[in-house]
């Protein structure tokens, strides 16, 4: 009973979402924050559209985030669909979104967290809830479902899967231990930079940028 009370009635102190995903979501979807974030993303996305129109290429969007804290877990669904909405408003369909999601165990080696079972439990609960939601929205095209978010000036509605591809990034290593946070994040950064900058030669002798492989992991 006490565990249930603490889960549904968290005590909020200081700033941030305090590992409470409902607060993290509210921080994004309130009118002022939502429009501010959308405006910033629109500027970047419209620039990308203008550049790719010249080359007849795709716009590839990478979203890297954790889903164990209140902020990441709370925003993980609405932020990608904000991106979908921006492309839809621009009438642009030649784009893909790749999600790289850090699982909760990535943070387990942080000294201040490792010694606190309550925080670990919160991180695991947030991660589980977020991953269940991602799993659902990865298949809405097949189930004919929709994402629908009421906002101040109407609704954000999309029938597209949340990501074109989704990769989960764990903190565990091959020996069963947990890497330090900077090691896990550094390896993903190195991997993505290699993919974004490397060029391969196809069988037909055509130069192909390896960045296309970033989105080949379907689900």
Model region roles, listed by residue range:
Residues 60-61, 82:
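Subunit-assembly interface segments of extracellular/virion macromolecular structures
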Residues 65-77:
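Gly/Ser/Thr-rich loops at beta-strand to alpha-helix junctions
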Residues 77-89:
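A glycine- and small-aliphatic-rich helix-loop capping segment at beta-alpha/alpha-beta transitions
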Residues 1-59, 67, 88-219:
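Terminal, contiguous helix-loop blocks that mediate binding/assembly
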